[in-house]
Amino acid sequence: MSGLLKFITCGSVDDGKSTLIGHILYDSKLLYADQEKALELDSKVGSRGGAIDYSLLLDGLMAEREQGITIDVAYRYFTTEKRSFIVADTPGHEEYTRNMAVGASFADLAVILVDAKQGVLVQTRRHARICALMGIRYFVFAVNKMDLVDYSEERFKEIVDQIQELSKELHLASVKIIPVSATEGDNVTTHSDNMPWYTQEPLLAYLENIDVSEKKQEEGFYMPVQRVCRPDHTFRGFQGPVSYTHLRAHETL
């Protein structure tokens, strides 16, 4: 499937969003040699005890690297042989939900991560609802950390039931559920030998092939507000990205 795919990664805290995208970039050979070397060096002092920490490819702020979390929205552009992508890697903490909502406002598809040990959590549900409210029609639920549940098909089916219940509640039409391990690479870019019971496409192949051309383009002015700016009591401004319109200076909205 040709054409640009804009998607968001979201979900609850520590579900592995940055690690997943970092592993896609790493496995797809989309890094320069100096980037790979820097990743190896940074991982030695990171939060994974010396093992390669793929999340460092997305976590750019010093505070993010020190704490092992995502705070801001990290946008990355990459291209495979089949498709070009822009991904918005968003934070999972509740206090940064507004940043997640801004990332969702630009996306055609949402990749929502679910921890295989914990299942669907409150923040998982919140992010799915926000994505639906933002008009996203295509959803991929990546059931991550399958290595921590011994790649159990039974556990995967339990979480599938939770996701299907959520999808029904939110009236989600297009839903794909894929079992993955972002740290180990299972079903991220290639099929997993650890999960022979899953015979469908791995995540990257699904993203390369899905057709999102039916997404309805909204008309008129559309600007998700990320921040209210009040330098003093005489002024109130709004900051955020502008989509689906063309503006001119001094134009009245």
For each predicted feature, which ranges?
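Helix-rich terminal scaffold detector
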Residues: K6-C10, T19-I21, L25, L113, ...
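Conserved beta-strand/loop subsegment of P-loop NTPase cores
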Residues: A110-L113, I136-M146, S167-V180
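Short, structured beta-strand/loop micro-motifs enriched in basic residues and often containing a Trp
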Residues: P231-G240
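Conserved Switch II/interswitch segment of TRAFAC-class P-loop GTPases
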Residues: E94, F106-R125, V140, D147-E154
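P-loop NTPase switch module centered on the Walker A-proximal segment
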Residues: S2-R98, A107, A142
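Active-site phosphate-binding and catalytic loops of NTP-dependent enzymes
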Residues: R48, D59-I69, K168-V175, E208-F221
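Canonical P-loop GTPase G-domain recognition
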Residues: Y151-N209
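Single conserved hydrophobic/aromatic residue that forms the stacking wall/gate
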Residues: H246-L253
